[in-house]
Amino acid sequence: MILDFNKIEEKALANFKGGEKALNAKMNVDENNKILGGRLEPGASIGEHTHETNSEIIFFTSGKGKVIYDGKEERVEAGLCHYCPQGHNHTLINDSDDDLTFYAVIPEHPAR
């Protein structure tokens, strides 16, 4: 199955997960997975949250920023991949002067 993010409408999700400004996202969602192309403008963030029933893989395609993962800061930039396993928490912050763009996959996990 091909997902053409060039044809998916971008939606601004204000204060996503309690973050600052908006997450601009192109999303494909089904019963088991969320796949999105995301863009955070300078100063925007995704608020801190815990992945209770899923995990998240984020591959950064442009820009720079930081992830706070289980309380520890990690610098991110194009070409890096961040993984947040089920049961862990993170936040994503664009603290640069350019857009931070990425693709994220959030697969649901069966009940333990």
Residue ranges and their predicted role:
Residues 1-34, 47:
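A short, N-terminal "cap"/entry segment at the start of jelly-roll beta-barrel domains
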Residues 86-112:
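Ligand-binding loop in jelly-roll beta-barrel domains
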Residues 45-47, 66, 82, 86-92:
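Histidine-centered metal-chelating micro-motifs
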Residues 36-51:
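Conserved short histidine dyad/triad with adjacent acidic residue
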Residues 72-86:
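Short acidic-glycine-tyrosine-enriched beta hairpin
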Residues 38, 58, 82:
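Conserved GNAT-family N-acetyltransferase fold
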